[in-house]
Regions:
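Amphipathic alpha-helical scaffolding segments comprising HEAT/armadillo-like alpha-solenoid repeats
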Residues: 1-5, 28-44, 63-76, 95-115, ...
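N-terminal leader/linker segments that initiate helical-solenoid repeat arrays
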Residues: 1-22
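Alpha-helix N-cap/helix-start positions at coil->helix boundaries
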Residues: 15, 49-50, 65, 79-83, ...
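Alpha-solenoid HEAT/ARM repeat scaffold
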Residues: 19, 53-54, 69, 82-87, ...
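HEAT-repeat alpha-solenoid elements in large eukaryotic scaffold proteins
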Residues: 41-50, 82-92, 117, 157-163
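Structural signature of alpha-helical solenoid repeat scaffolds
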Residues: 61, 90-94, 132, 164-165, ...
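Ankyrin-repeat and related helical/solenoid repeat scaffolds used for protein-protein interactions
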Residues: 153, 157-210
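Eukaryotic acidic, Ser/Thr-rich intrinsically disordered low-complexity regions
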Residues: 210-250
Length: 250
């Protein structure tokens, strides 16, 4: 099968969810044509989110170790290629599609950290999300900085969301994550003007501290301002109380 030509044909039809499309996505992931799959993924990432074909991203992990090695070799390419490779590699880690040794893991993380400082907001956004999937305790301070100082509201939101991912994955102990993020989350709730970012920060606090302020993800996604502000006030009091208890104990 000529995967590129078949992709273009299906794309011209709007990439419909049909048996034909599903068979194409399955065959692409099981093929040895990793480069074409990556090229198609890069083309999809240039499309608006609502126009992207399903399965192109998810199916890449089917290439296993060979796909991982190909992506590692693309991390030093220009920024739009490198961020696509880094994002896919991070998803590899989450899906456990193949094992990366310590050196390979360090290479992935180093590339994501480099991309997190790029001028292009979309590149920073995707790298910050991916850092949440694969980052360690050492990366918390970098996420803290982006949470409080990044000029892009989604970069700030995804920095908070990365703490949530770290907490859910249990790669970092909850006591460490709480201690290293509490101050920045307090400052975020005090100063953040973007409702979505503030809502994501509250969701993160609910997860990392295993508590609830009555804020649902659907309320954040639909920007229910009153619900977000009400939960934010509760979360701020909660974290400040945690601070005062720690100060008293010390």
């Amino acid at each position: 099968m000529d995967f590129l030509e078949e992709y273009k044909r299906l794309k011209a039809q709007g990439f419909p969810i049909t048996e034909e499309t599903i068979n194409f996505v399955t065959a692409l992931g099981k093929s040895d044509d990793i480069e074409t799959h990556f090229d198609i993924y890069c083309m999809e990432m240039k499309c608006p989110k609502q126009e992207r074909g399903f399965g192109i991203y998810e199916g890449f992990a089917d290439h296993g170790k060979a796909g991982g090695e190909y992506l590692l070799a693309r991390l030093d390419d220009e920024e739009d290629i490198a961020i696509n490779a880094g994002y896919l590699l991070s998803s590899y880690r989450v899906q456990k599609a193949c094992h990366f040794n310590a050196e390979e893991n360090a290479t992935i993380l180093r590339a994501l950290l480099r991309l997190a400082e790029f001028k292009t907001a979309e590149v920073r956004r995707r790298s910050l999300i991916a850092i949440g999937w694969v980052g360690t305790e050492k990366e918390i301070e970098i996420l803290n900085r982006h949470l409080l100082t990044d000029e892009d509201s989604l970069c700030r939101a995804w920095s908070a969301s990365s703490f949530l991912q770290m907490g859910m994955s249990q790669r970092i102990g909850s006591d460490i994550l709480q201690a290293k993020t509490r101050d920045s989350l307090i400052k975020c709730l005090q100063s953040e003007t973007n409702a979505f970012t503030k809502g994501v920060a509250v969701e993160t606090i609910q997860t990392v501290w295993d508590t609830s302020f009555g804020l649902r993800a659907s309320a954040v996604d639909s920007l229910k301002i009153k619900a977000i502000e009400r939960a934010s006030a509760k979360a701020l009091l909660f974290l400040e109380h945690k601070d005062s208890r720690l100060t008293h104990q010390n």
